[in-house]
């Protein structure tokens, strides 16, 4: 029984995370970003969102949380390193990578509020 309960919790958390990623993507679209990838997976890790605005590439970690501050705290050093490695791999596959500046952001998706965008969070 415990395994089924954990499995249901995991599925529920995964659905909540996917919904948060789509809300964050919509919010960024409204802010003028173009979404290049959602849940970009590499052997080094996953990037929740990759967005572009002019000559800027934003690598975005999305967190569904009750408060924005806890979302920023939830992205620890190990997660940051994994995201950076995945971003480096993504960039290495682009011929035009040299013309972009790169930034790492966090978007906190909060209940009954607009998402909070933490620019250059790490």
Swiss-Prot record:
Query: Under which name does UniProt file this protein?
Result: UPF0102 protein Atu0303
A Pfam family recorded for this sequence: UPF0102
PANTHER family given for it?
A: UPF0102 PROTEIN YRAN
Similarity comment text for this entry? Belongs to the UPF0102 family.
Query: InterPro entries, alphabetically?
Result: Restrct_endonuc-II-like, tRNA_endonuc-like_dom_sf, UPF0102_YraN-like
Entries under NCBIfam families matching the protein: PRK12497.1-5, YraN family protein
> What domain of life does the native source organism fall in?
Bacteria
The record lists the organism as Agrobacterium fabrum (strain C58 / ATCC 33970)
GO MF annotation, one? nucleic acid binding
């Amino acid at each position: 029984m415990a395994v089924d309960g954990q499995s249901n919790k995991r599925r529920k958390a995964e659905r909540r995370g996917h919904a948060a990623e789509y809300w964050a993507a919509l919010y960024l679209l409204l802010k003028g970003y173009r979404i290049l990838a959602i849940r970009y997976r590499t052997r080094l890790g996953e990037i929740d969102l990759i967005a572009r605005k002019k000559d800027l590439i934003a690598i975005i970690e999305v967190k569904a949380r009750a408060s924005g501050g806890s979302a920023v705290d939830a992205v620890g050093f190990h997660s940051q390193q994994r995201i950076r490695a995945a971003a480096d791999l993504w960039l290495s596959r682009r011929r035009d990578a040299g013309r972009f500046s790169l930034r790492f952001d966090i978007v906190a998706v909060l209940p009954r509020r607009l998402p909070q965008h933490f620019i250059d969070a790490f």
